[in-house]
């Protein structure tokens, strides 16, 4: 019925339970009553307080389910929606006079009211509490900083006999310190003061206009237009490098940083564009290929490959010998050693994400990555630093996948089929009807299935070894692992062994193992 009528479960429940509002439905009322208990007030007595009670009741339900689904507070996408809901709930808690951490107490009520229908809430209770409490603590710190500044402003106003806080100060509190304007307004009202609303609106409009003009100026100076826009928009480069590292193609265009040219001689730094290439262009965190381009009259060293406009691949190159020209046939050769080193790190990044999700939980999602020939850097959603034990477990699991010599399969398929297989997609990424899926392992031994357009090895055993070199914070709710594979692990071990040996010699110890005694 609720689906056909579009009335929603809560509205249907309010009819069945013969109550006036969804906030009087049994499961919602229990949360509302808990909010009132924490705030020390009664619902239905004061309009402004009732609004705050309803906001907290609604938002704590939403963010509890969002956290259960693996979403973390952030500054973009769903994470941003979650952050705004969380902070709005905390802010209304302040308006009700709640000063300490209180969201974690309400989570218990939300879970108790919904665990029969959604048993994953109870399973993830501790995790949900950690996520919400961390964000609440961070926002409280923001509020505390803003309160100190606002208290100083109020004291100065009282000293000067003023009753209105100027719009510029209100805007600075909001824009620079993240202190909500409605909380500023509420605190001023308690002191018998007001906020210069018109002045605040003017500052806000001025900032928007400044940002708009800055963008327009940037566009006017040509930063949004490059030499590559001068090339026919229908021209594109076909990538043939998934299964080959060499290929022949015609040089279609040669450019400098700012103009199209017909030829280039030894010593020139140029961009070479062709209709086909085995060179992978930087994308998805995987760096562009390097190598050589050779014609009958010249040789170029490719130092980078980038996707430019409308599907065109630009080979950044230095002409080392002779001369090259538009229209010449050329032989393109990717540097094999570098490509395979990059593929080791990229394939291992997939195994790393799979291991992180097993050790830390399914809330872990890729938030960014960089894979080059020397290392892999993987950013992921997680709310606090990994323990030493967790890092060891992740390392052990990744190396287990490597030693199991799992086959790596790459295939294109309809997106619906990929989703049925449970392939991991990058949050916020837009995909077409057909996607490329990378699968590591088979059947019960499948370690990873991900959407990915990058290049990979054919078997996990070719990664060799995996070792985490560091784990750190990038932003609130985002952690970063830097790691090495293959020969990089040996180099890291040798470097650390040398450091330990030096420490032992400094302490005049014959055996480095005696350092820990």
Regions found by a protein language model. Give the residues of each.
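A glycine- and charged-residue-rich anion-binding loop/surface
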Residues: 3-517
């Amino acid at each position: 019925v609720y689906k056909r009528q579009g009335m929603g479960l809560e509205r249907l429940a309010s009819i069945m339970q013969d109550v006036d509002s969804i906030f009087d439905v049994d499961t919602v009322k229990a949360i509302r009553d808990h909010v009132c208990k924490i705030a020390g007030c009664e619902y239905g007595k004061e309009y402004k307080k009732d609004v705050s009670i309803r906001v907290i009741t609604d938002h704590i339900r939403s963010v509890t389910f969002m956290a259960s689904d693996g979403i973390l507070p952030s500054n973009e996408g769903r994470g941003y929606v979650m952050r705004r809901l969380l902070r709005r709930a905390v802010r209304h808690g302040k308006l009700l006079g709640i000063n300490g951490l209180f969201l974690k107490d309400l989570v218990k009520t939300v879970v108790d009211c919904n665990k029969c229908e959604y048993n994953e809430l109870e399973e993830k209770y501790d995790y949900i509490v950690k996520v919400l409490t961390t964000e609440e603590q961070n926002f409280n710190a923001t509020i505390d900083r803003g309160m100190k500044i606002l208290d100083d402003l109020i004291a100065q106003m009282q000293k000067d006999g003023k009753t209105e806080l100027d719009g510029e100060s209100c805007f600075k509190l909001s824009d620079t310190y993240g202190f909500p304007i409605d909380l500023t307004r509420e605190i001023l009202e308690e002191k018998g003061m007001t906020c210069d609303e018109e002045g605040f609106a003017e500052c806000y409009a001025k900032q928007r206009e400044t940002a708009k003009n800055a963008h327009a100026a940037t566009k006017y100076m040509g930063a949004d237009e490059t030499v590559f826009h001068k090339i026919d928009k229908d021209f594109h480069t076909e990538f043939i490098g998934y299964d080959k590292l060499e290929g022949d193609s015609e040089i279609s265009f040669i450019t400098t940083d700012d103009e199209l040219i017909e030829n280039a001689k030894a010593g020139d730094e140029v961009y070479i564009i062709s209709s086909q290439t085995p060179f992978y262009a930087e994308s998805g965190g995987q760096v562009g290929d390097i190598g050589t381009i050779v014609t009958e009259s010249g040789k170029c060293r490719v130092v980078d490959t980038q996707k430019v406009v409308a599907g065109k691949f630009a080979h950044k190159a230095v002409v080392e010998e002779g001369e090259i020209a538009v229209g010449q046939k050329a032989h393109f050769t990717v540097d094999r050693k570098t490509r395979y080193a990059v593929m080791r790190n990229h394939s291992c990044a997939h195994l790393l994400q799979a291991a992180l999700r097993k050790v830390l939980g399914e809330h872990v999602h890729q938030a960014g990555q960089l894979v080059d020939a020397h290392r892999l850097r993987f950013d992921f959603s997680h709310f606090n630093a990994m323990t030493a034990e967790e890092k060891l477990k992740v390392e052990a699991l990744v190396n287990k996948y490597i030693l199991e010599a799992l086959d790596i399969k790459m295939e294109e398929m309809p997106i619906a089929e990929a989703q049925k297989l449970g392939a991991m997609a990058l949050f916020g990424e837009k995909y077409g009807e057909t996607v490329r899926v990378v699968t590591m392992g088979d059947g019960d031994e499948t370690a990873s299935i991900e959407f990915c357009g990058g290049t990979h090895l054919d078997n996990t055993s070719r990664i060799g070894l995996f070792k985490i070199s560091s784990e750190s914070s990038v932003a609130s709710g985002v952690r970063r692992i830097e790691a090495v594979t293959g020969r990089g692990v040996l180099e890291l071990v040798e470097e650390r062994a040398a450091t330990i040996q030096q420490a032992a010699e400094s302490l005049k110890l014959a055996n480095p193992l005696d350092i820990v005694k």
